[in-house]
Design a protein with these regions (language model features):
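Catalytic histidine neighborhood in serine/cysteine hydrolases
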Residues: 283-293
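Alpha/beta-hydrolase active-site loop
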Residues: 147-168
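An N-terminal hydrophobic leader/cap segment in hydrolases
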Residues: 9-82
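Conserved alpha/beta-hydrolase
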Residues: 123-143
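Short beta-strand/loop motif that positions the catalytic acidic residue
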Residues: 257-259, 264-266, 270
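Conserved alpha/beta-hydrolase "acid-adjacent" motif
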Residues: 271-277
């Protein structure tokens, strides 16, 4: 009798542990900090359908590299704030001659100060904009162990806006400009109290929610289209280890509260963050808005 009970129990336990292992691996891959790790040569076990911004195949490699080199040549001021959960966060401030406005740049997933926003930073600087390159938690020179897909980054963006406002003696208008996860964080931050000098938001290819983005990533990277159990496990690890729930990384409530104008734009062929995310954010937004796809 005992043997009959032990066998199915052992099978169920093995299945449970196997599923838990999958959930842990997914959490470790998408949420845990990978800064400083050396990539090992190994056989690919998943394929991405999108191309990196600086890949020669997309035609922007030269512009990308030139813009990044330009950023590295500029003299910038190191800036630091303490996040609401005690992390030391880093940014670089680039002043412009006769500045007319200040733009806070919020980079994307696993990005850093001089990544895919380098070209836009150069353009903004040449058009009389002071630029603050923030580095999100777990990226660049900022502290942190986990990427929270906007759940905590939204508060960091708010803190940076306050930091800039307190030092903005000329009361120049401030704009929040985010890309990908950075755009989602900017949109989420708009639901909180921001300085009066913040006059508008720019959201480049931002996602609408972490849960939706996880579904898209699972389908795109691993060809997994039905993952309710995996999402439950991921959320459990996020709560237990990283101190947030996936529902905390969602733009819906912020878009209902936001009163500042928002420019949404998205590449129609984006396969990393699908264009329907910007359309959803646009539809949720109750403030003055424009969508360009």
């Amino acid at each position: 009798m005992k043997k009959k009970l032990i066998r199915p129990f052992a099978i169920l336990l093995a299945v449970f542990l196997g599923l838990l292992e999958v959930g842990w691996r997914f959490f470790n891959m998408v949420v845990c900090c990978k800064r400083g790790e050396h990539k090992k040569e190994r056989k690919k076990w998943f394929e991405l359908s999108h191309i990196r911004e600086n890949h020669p195949r997309n035609g922007y490699a030269r512009v990308y590299n030139e813009s990044k080199a330009w950023c590295l040549e500029q003299k910038m001021q190191d800036c630091y704030i303490k996040s609401i959960d005690g992390l030391k966060l880093h940014a670089l401030y680039l002043p412009a001659e006769d500045a007319k406005r200040i733009v806070i740049l919020s980079h994307g997933y696993r990005g850093s100060r001089f990544g895919t926003l380098s070209f836009m930073a150069k353009y903004l600087h040449e058009h009389q904009c002071d630029v603050l390159f923030i580095e999100h938690r777990c990226c660049g020179d900022s502290e942190g162990k986990y990427i929270t897909f906007g759940a905590k980054e939204q508060w960091d963006v708010q803190q940076w806006a306050v930091y800039v406002s307190e030092r903005n003696k000329e009361k120049l208008p401030i704009y929040l400009y985010g890309q990908s996860m950075g755009a989602a964080a900017v949109l989420m931050a708009s639901g909180h109290t921001l300085p009066a000098e913040v006059k508008g938001l720019i959201a480049d290819c931002g996602f609408q929610s972490m849960e939706g983005q996880m579904r898209d990533m699972a389908a795109n990277w691993f060809h997994l289209h039905h993952i309710p159990l995996l999402l439950i496990e991921l959320d459990w690890f996020c709560s237990l280890l990283a101190g947030f729930h996936m529902k905390d990384a969602d733009t819906a409530e912020a878009m209902k509260k936001n009163t500042r104008p928002v420019l949404f734009f998205h590449g129609e062929k984006d396969t990393y963050v699908y264009p329907n995310n910007s359309f959803q954010n646009y539809m949720l937004c109750r403030a003055e808005k424009e969508l360009v796809i």
